[in-house]
Amino acid sequence: MSRTASGKNGTWRNWGGNVAARPVREVTPASVDELAEAVRRAAEDGLKVKAVGTGHSFTSIAATDGVLIRPQLLTGIRNIDRDNMTVTVEAGTPLKRLNLALAREGLSLTNMGDIMEQTVSGATSTGTHGTGRESASIAAQIKGLELVTADGSVLTCSEKGTEEERSLFAAARIGLGALGIVTAITFAVEPIFLLTAREEPMPFDKVLADFDELWAENEHFEFYWFPHTGSTNTKRNNRSAGPRKPVGQVSSWIEDEFLSNGVFQVAQWVGRAVPATIPTIAQVSSKALSARTYTDIPYKVFTSPRRVRFMEMEYAVPREAVTETLRELKAMLDRSGLRVSFPVEVRTAPADDITLSTASGRDSAYIAVHMVKGTPYQGYFTAAERIFTAHEGRPHWGKVHTRDAEYFAGIYPGFGEFTALRDRLDPDRLFQNDYLRRVLGA
């Protein structure tokens, strides 16, 4: 187990560059026992403890001035159980590595988010999700968890455990790092399958008018709306018998790298320097991506490269409220004078039973707003958040928001159960930081 200062001048920064922390020490445990020892030693020294993955959260959920746990040595697959169709993986394993390993075994997760750079524990602990009629959240695919609690104990929990274990399982799948440090996750898997993706432009008004039909007819539907235009780019993913027809290398480079990252990055720079050009840039951007259809294994369809750095806010609203919420967002932008060069992303998720999941107990739709890194975003995000919260929106735990414990107590029926469990597992708040103090209370 190594102990070092964190980053340049002892400073850790997140991917978005908006969160920085200076931990007293950084620990890289090579085993669960070493991690438990690091937790016990931090408690003895009176220091707070947080684990950090790849830093893709825009909130300070992983920041600490105490002990920062780096899980990069806690990686790899522990076990594949083909009888029960599960895989148990070390918590620091990047999703990309997990997907590649599963594919080699002829297996796959059921759903994924937009990217796969995050660690499995970081992605699940913050509620990372994709889009889907019957599936979306990565955490909802969890069948079992192992975590180290504040006293250094190693606990396991699953949906088939004791009543106490089931209570922990319901909360810890999206535990925000508040209940302990996750060390291993058991996911449900299935035989690898093919998805056919159909991407095509569609007018904004038509998408909203046909939204219920588009959602019902597709296993995975999402779209991007370009502010200052009436245009969207839609994506429909559905299971396919094949044959496999991946995007060609040239087409992939043009669409996913040159247009979606290279040219898009330049357009963002121009828009940031000369905001008056943004409506024109938006019109051009909305027409740049052409319709295409391709068929491939799941992670190659669900995920795509994201190299343009940005800031993001995302809220889950009741699915039946999404079209009205989007109309209000568009009306706000039309009258506000704000200039937004980044598309708005819209996805869906079915209700689940995870205590602090943004889809807990209700079918949900996600609306994500973005601004390129370095561009003032507060005015846009504040106005958008006002609209989202008016529809009982639940913010993504790892994305920008201003909500606090009082708000969450009103929109999560199980909020009190979660905080009571936290009181039992971490009474001295070893895993506390400023973010958790705000969203969960002292």
Regions found by a protein language model. Give the residues of each.
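Noncatalytic alpha-helical scaffold of FAD-dependent oxidoreductases
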Residues: 1-442
